[in-house]
Amino acid sequence: MKHLIPIIIGLLALVGFADSVYLTLAHFRVIDPITLESSGVCSLTVGSCMKVILSPKATVAGIPHAVLGAAYFAVLLGAATIRMMIGRWFAPFEMFAFLLAGFAFSAYLTQELVLRMHAPCPFCLTAHAINAFVLALYAISIQP
């Protein structure tokens, strides 16, 4: 089972990366936010996708959260690939710290989405859920 975990983490990282890139494109209006809002996924929570993407809280120091997510998931994909190539996690402590920091940021953003903005954006919550699963899988994979 442990040899499958890096593959699963890599696949989850790909999904998270695609999700974050999609949200980045919507943030920069390469994808029309109206099109995003009318998608089947965003129509489940009327108005939440637009509210989140257009919110001034959707950035940190001018960098959209989705861009940070894309970079985060790209690093995860690279780490999973290296793990599959060399048979062990490269810098396991640093990787755990990186994942823990990402999880903490995701927990904060989820709290903001649900409790403060009252906008449970399905695309955002998907990235946050993936983050939690990856942390759990990584913790399992580093056990002796």
Annotate each language-model stretch with its function.
Residues 2-144:
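Membrane-interfacial helix-loop segments of redox and metal-homeostasis proteins
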